[in-house]
């Protein structure tokens, strides 16, 4: 099998597929509150295009798929997309990242269709604050979604918490306490300067050492763990006696580019080899032309930088006062 390897020796076996740029929330670090323009439906990859693309990609070693958005559960055919991917025997793992507003309704059907596990965005455990950060989200719907995911067996369940200075950094111990009784993985993620978030990044960024300081102040003893399926770049720990775990993902302060094994496919059919790099290849016209398609995929991988050089990119954007990246919901979270 010919593997998808870049010039630095990194083998790519994992792809994140955005199935929509639309979302029912407007999280402060992801999207502006108004003035958004979304892709017309005909510009978005269809179920058949996504499945055809993946039937080719598995021949080159891709074996893990994460479905993202936007909010992927807004797709009326999301269960059929999962079922189509689940019918490809070479795919070992199918996961989804969701805000969980509709997860309680769809979790069982998704599990039956072949979904392996779920990541849920949850940035506050306080109703009013959660509503403010998401600009309209309902915390109870997320909690109901978590419960339903547990009931149907979508394990491991991971909760993604973007740490935002002055907005939810006083809830760290609340989230840590959440792991004591629930078999879930809380993942604290550094605030990233992407698209809409780029202009306010420095004001809201907190290094993830803050997590360990909170542990120590609360008197929590913790130890590293490394047995969580699909843990990716997360460094994981368990508080003594807890059922669940917590992890830290620090793409800003300690990037993990040297072990990056992932590609991204945007909802409109562009391959990106690096989340923080502008270069992308439009593969949609060639989904039925496997030779040309794989040439473009390999070209994207060949051009992948050794690391994302985020600091340099930020400096350029601050000077021009104009972020050049797509917003996160356009790339796929």
Swiss-Prot record:
Pfam families: Fer4_12, Mob_synth_C, Radical_SAM. Residues 7-221 form the Radical SAM core domain. One of its GO terms (biological process) is Mo-molybdopterin cofactor biosynthetic process. It catalyses: GTP + AH2 + S-adenosyl-L-methionine = (8S)-3',8-cyclo-7,8-dihydroguanosine 5'-triphosphate + 5'-deoxyadenosine + L-methionine + A + H(+). Pathway: Cofactor biosynthesis; molybdopterin biosynthesis. [4Fe-4S] cluster 1 binds at residues 23, 27, 30. The keyword GTP-binding applies. The keyword 4Fe-4S applies. [4Fe-4S] cluster 2 binds at residues 257, 260, 274. PROSITE patterns: MOAA_NIFB_PQQE, RADICAL_SAM. It comes from the Bacteria. Binds 2 [4Fe-4S] clusters. Binds 1 [4Fe-4S] cluster coordinated with 3 cysteines and an exchangeable S-adenosyl-L-methionine and 1 [4Fe-4S] cluster coordinated with 3 cysteines and the GTP-derived substrate. GTP binds at residues 16, 66, 97, 158, 262-264. Its EC number is 4.1.99.22. S-adenosyl-L-methionine binds at residues 29, 70, 121, 192. Its cofactor is [4Fe-4S] cluster. GO terms for molecular function: 4 iron, 4 sulfur cluster binding; cyclic pyranopterin monophosphate synthase activity; GTP 3',8'-cyclase activity; GTP binding; metal ion binding; S-adenosyl-L-methionine binding. Keywords: 4Fe-4S, GTP-binding, Iron, Iron-sulfur, Lyase, Metal-binding, Molybdenum cofactor biosynthesis, Nucleotide-binding, S-adenosyl-L-methionine. Signal peptide: none annotated. HAMAP family: MoaA_B. Catalyzes the cyclization of GTP to (8S)-3',8-cyclo-7,8-dihydroguanosine 5'-triphosphate. Monomer and homodimer. Belongs to the radical SAM superfamily. MoaA family. This is GTP 3',8-cyclase.
């Amino acid at each position: 099998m010919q593997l998808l390897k870049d010039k630095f020796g990194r083998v790519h076996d994992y792809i994140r597929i955005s199935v929509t740029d639309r979302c029912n929330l407007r999280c402060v670090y992801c999207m502006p509150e108004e003035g958004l323009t979304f892709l017309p439906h005909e510009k978005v990859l269809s179920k058949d295009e996504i499945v055809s693309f993946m039937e080719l990609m598995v021949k080159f070693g891709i074996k893990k798929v994460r479905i993202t958005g936007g909010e992927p559960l807004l797709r009326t055919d999301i269960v059929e997309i999962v079922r189509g991917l689940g019918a490809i025997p070479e795919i070992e793992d199918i996961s989804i990242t969701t805000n969980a507003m509709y997860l309680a309704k769809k979790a069982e059907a998704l599990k039956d269709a072949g979904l392996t596990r779920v990541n849920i965005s949850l940035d506050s455990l306080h109703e009013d604050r959660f509503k403010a950060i998401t600009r309209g989200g309902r915390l109870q719907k997320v909690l109901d979604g978590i419960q339903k995911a547990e009931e149907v067996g979508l394990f491991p369940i991971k909760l993604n918490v973007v740490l935002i200075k002055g907005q939810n950094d006083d809830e760290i111990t609340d989230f840590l306490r959440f792991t004591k009784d629930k078999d879930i993985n809380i993942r604290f993620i550094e605030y990233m300067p992407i698209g809409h978030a780029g202009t306010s990044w420095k004001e809201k960024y907190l290094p993830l050492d803050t997590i360990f300081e909170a542990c120590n102040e609360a008197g929590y003893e913790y130890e590293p763990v490394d047995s969580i399926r699909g843990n990716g770049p997360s460094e994981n720990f368990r508080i003594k006696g807890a059922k669940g775990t917590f992890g830290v993902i620090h793409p800003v302060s300690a990037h993990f580019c040297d072990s990056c094994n992932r590609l991204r496919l945007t909802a409109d059919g562009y391959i990106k080899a690096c989340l923080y790099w502008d270069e992308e290849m439009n593969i949609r016209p060639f989904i039925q032309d496997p030779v040309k398609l794989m040439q473009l995929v390999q070209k994207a991988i060949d051009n992948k930088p050794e690391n994302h050089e985020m600091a340099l990119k930020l400096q350029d954007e601050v000077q021009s006062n104009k972020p050049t990246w797509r917003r996160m919901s356009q790339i796929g979270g």
